[in-house]
Amino acid sequence: MNLRSASPADAELVAKLGRDSFIAAFGHLYSAADLASFLAANHAPGIVAAQLADPAMRCRIAEDAGAPLGFCKLMLRPAWPEHGAARFAIELKQLYCAAGTTGRGTGAALMDWALAEARGVGADAVRLSVWSENTGAQKFYARYGFTHLADIDFWVGSQRDDEYLYELRLN
């Protein structure tokens, strides 16, 4: 497995991987209209290209023999400042792995990169949101020391989901 930096030229790849991963994991939970609205707002190539061009965004793509396995986006701006006491909490925006790649170490490699990057920019905390019923992801984050910080809302189209805000304090 190889991790490489993403650039705006990777927007279509990251957008497709994001769309496909979200649909595989959660698509069955939403109406077609809500899902389409969410995907257009979050996983359209133009949206992703703008994110990847943002100097405050860091993104790594995991590949195996050129085949994409996953990606991780880290936003180097304060995340959810209304919660917690961290001085500089940044957001782990997305950590998505392709369907069928669970257990291959992709998520762990991307998380290790994200935490090293966060420490490298002087963050004292990393925050992320996770669906309240996604116990698999919650267990993954707990293994790294993330803890529940707050309950927040997450919108997929017009559907509100209960989401947990997790935080990892960095030493």
Please tell me what each predicted stretch does:
Residues 1-2:
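Extreme N-terminal starter segment of soluble prokaryotic enzymes
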Residues 5-11, 16-30, 36-100, 108-113, ...:
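Acetyl-CoA-dependent GNAT
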Residues 12, 138-139:
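Alpha-helical segments flanking ligand/cofactor-binding loops in enzyme cores
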Residues 79-80, 127-130, 142, 147-164:
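Conserved catalytic-core motifs of GNAT/GCN5-like acyltransferases
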Residues 98-100, 104, 132-133:
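Active-site acidic-Proline motif in GNAT/NAT acetyltransferases
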Residues 105, 122, 145:
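Short glycine-rich hinge loops at helix-strand junctions in the catalytic core
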Residues 110, 134-137:
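Conserved short alpha-helix immediately C-terminal to the canonical SAM/SAH-binding motif I
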